[in-house]
Amino acid sequence: MKIQGTIVDLLVAPLGPGELLLGFVGGGMVRGLVVGLLTWGVALVFAGFQLAHPLVTLGFLLGTAYVFSVLGLATAIWAEKFEQINFFPTFVMLPLTFLGGVFYSISRLPEPWRTISHFNPMVYMVEGLRYGMLGTGALPPALGALILFLLAVGSTAVTYALLARGYKLKQ
């Protein structure tokens, strides 16, 4: 929207930064959850299983979708060209995801890599979802929920500040 110039329509509307944040993040969450649920539905066809802790799974799904949506909005505000939009997902999120225990349990890593992986916020999202879906995880889900909450609060504060200042939006 910003690069195409249609963001002007939203900026002149009587919407505050909180309302813009809520709208963009809500839309991003819905999109992410639909993609995730469709992926899970296809996986059920090939390997049916029961969720070990459905409420924990739902909580981590919502929290993870929220954080990714807020970070996506912050990236969109920061980017000035289409090429820059892919910087954050490609050079930050993708490596953190692959090093975050998606394809392996961090409990199997040798030291010092196990300790280093605890500084990756993606580990806590992955382990929380792993616990909720499979009933097992290398980290306590309460710790993962706390880290996810702190990440959500921090990313929301930064993105809200960017919207409130009109950073790279009002040019």
What do these predicted ranges mean?
Residues 17-89, 136-160:
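Alpha-helical transmembrane segments and their short interhelical loops
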